[in-house]
């Protein structure tokens, strides 16, 4: 049962406006969602912040998000704050997100980290459809719990799936299952003493494998690696003992990518 009596929905569709920049063509949302009007921090790159007017996700909360980024749009989507998953008791909270990125469009999806509280159970499913000319920078950061309270890996279960298709052909699939009841989260194959995890995917972005590795090596307090996936796209995964090192690493990569992507001809 949803806290808001119905599934929480968000719809966003963008297009190129009269001035040649990305604008909102259509949008719709139900509580707790809201959207800020786009602003333009750099050239023709628009930035839209997704707002959730709530303390976080509770038992039974279900979110349905659909984002359609129009052809030639250049857009960065952010969130307002860290996302909290509260104690879901004997239930769970969920999110289904479908993203379409049109021809010659660029999307930088950069939400703040996800924090599962004690006994939290969360299910997330993201499907992203691209064209061959689409560019994507997509990330998620997962925290071990309320670190300042030493509440580490006390959540029930966290399961997120990311599926990326290019011209209807799958090019990337990630299935992250964190279940402290059945897995030692601190073993060397999992968090290995770290508390924050970054998963970043780059499709058709102007950054080389060697360049991404250099940025990881330059990042103090970060242990990570990057590899090529289908069609020479990149997947980067990193661990740290705080959110700031991972957010800084992600921002450095995004800055490098957008410097090229948003250059006016």
UniProtKB/Swiss-Prot annotation:
Pfam families, A to Z: UreD
Statement: the UniProt record of this protein carries the keyword Disulfide bond: no
Key word Chaperone present: yes
GO cellular component: cytoplasm
Compartments, as annotated in UniProt: Cytoplasm
Assigned keywords, A-Z: Chaperone, Cytoplasm, Nickel insertion
Cystine residue pairs: none
GO MF entries: nickel cation binding
Subunit details: UreH, UreF and UreG form a complex that acts as a GTP-hydrolysis-dependent molecular chaperone, activating the urease apoprotein by helping to assemble the nickel containing metallocenter of UreC. The UreE protein probably delivers the nickel.
Task performed by this protein: Required for maturation of urease via the functional incorporation of the urease nickel metallocenter.
Family named by the database record: Belongs to the UreD family.
Name recorded for this polypeptide: Urease accessory protein UreH
Species whose genome carries this gene: Helicobacter pylori (strain J99 / ATCC 700824)
């Amino acid at each position: 049962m949803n806290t808001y009596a119905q599934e929480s929905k968000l719809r966003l569709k963008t297009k190129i406006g009269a001035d040649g920049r990305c604008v909102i063509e259509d949008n719709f949302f139900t509580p707790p969602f809201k959207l800020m009007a786009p602003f333009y921090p750099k050239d023709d790159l628009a930035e839209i912040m997704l707002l959730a007017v709530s303390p976080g996700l509770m038992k039974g909360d279900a979110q349905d998000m659909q984002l359609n980024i129009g052809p030639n749009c250049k857009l960065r989507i952010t969130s307002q704050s860290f996302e909290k998953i509260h104690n879901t008791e004997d239930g769970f909270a969920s999110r289904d997100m479908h993203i379409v990125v049109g021809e010659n469009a660029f999307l930088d999806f950069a939400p703040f980290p996800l924090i599962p509280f004690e006994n939290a159970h969360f299910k997330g499913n993201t499907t992203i459809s691209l064209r061959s000319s689409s560019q994507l920078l997509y990330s998620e950061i997962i925290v071990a719990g309320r670190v300042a309270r030493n509440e580490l890996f006390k959540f029930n279960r966290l399961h997120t799936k990311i599926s990326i298709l290019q011209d209807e052909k799958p090019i990337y699939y990630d299935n992250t299952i964190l279940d402290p009841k059945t897995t030692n989260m601190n073993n060397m194959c999992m968090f290995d003493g770290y508390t924050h995890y970054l998963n970043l995917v780059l499709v058709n972005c102007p950054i080389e494998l060697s360049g991404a590795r250099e940025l990881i090596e330059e990042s103090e307090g970060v242990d990570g690696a990057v590899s090529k996936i289908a069609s020479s796209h990149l997947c980067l995964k990193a661990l740290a003992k705080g959110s700031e090192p991972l957010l800084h690493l992600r921002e450095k990569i995004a800055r490098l990518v957008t410097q090229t992507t948003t250059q006016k001809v």
